[in-house]
A protein has these predicted regions:
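Domain-level signal for soluble alpha/beta catalytic cores
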Residues: 1-128
Length: 128
C-alpha cells in the first residue's frame, strides 16, 4: 500500500525499477499490487511474474465513487498481456483504513466497493 490516510497517499511510482528482482526471485505464492491510479505505472512489469498469483488492486479504497465495471474489466484484460487470466485476481488497492482515522468513506460505501469487486470477479472468472 502506498498510504491510505484520510483518502490521501504518500508514495507514487511504477513497479518497473524492482520488478525483475521482486517478481522473478521472491519465493512467494502471490503479490497484492496497487493499480487503482496512474501512480502505479503500467502492467508491463508483470512480464517478470512466473507462476505466482497476482492480485490486481484496481478498486480504490480512498474514494466512494464506484469504478466503471467495463473499465475495470478492460484493465484486467490489459494485464493478461503479461499474466494469464487464471493467475489474476481482483481486490481493492488497499484496506479501507491504514490508520484509525480511516478514509473519507462511509461503511456502506466500503461495502459497495466490496460488492463491486465480487460482481466483476463473477463476470470475469465465473466458476473458475
Amino acid at each position: 500500500c502506498r498510504g491510505n490516510f484520510r483518502s490521501t497517499w504518500f508514495s507514487s511510482g511504477g513497479y518497473e525499477p524492482v520488478a525483475d528482482i521482486l517478481f522473478s526471485h521472491c519465493n512467494v505464492d502471490g503479490f497484492f499490487l496497487e493499480y487503482d491510479s496512474d501512480r502505479s505505472g503500467s502492467f508491463e512489469p508483470l512480464r517478470f511474474i512466473k507462476n505466482q498469483t497476482v492480485v490486481l488492486g484496481l478498486i480504490t479504497s480512498k474514494f466512494p465513487e464506484l469504478e466503471d465495471k467495463d473499465a475495470v474489466k478492460a484493465r484486467i484484460e490489459e494485464a493478461t498481456k503479461y499474466v494469464p487470466l487464471n493467475q489474476l485476481c481482483l481486490s481493492p488497492q488497499c484496506g479501507f483504513s491504514s490508520t484509525e482515522e480511516g478514509n473519507i468513506m462511509t461503511e456502506d460505501e466500503q461495502w459497495a466497493k466490496v460488492r463491486l469487486v465480487r460482481e466483476i470477479a463473477d463476470e470475469v472468472w465465473g466458476d473458475q
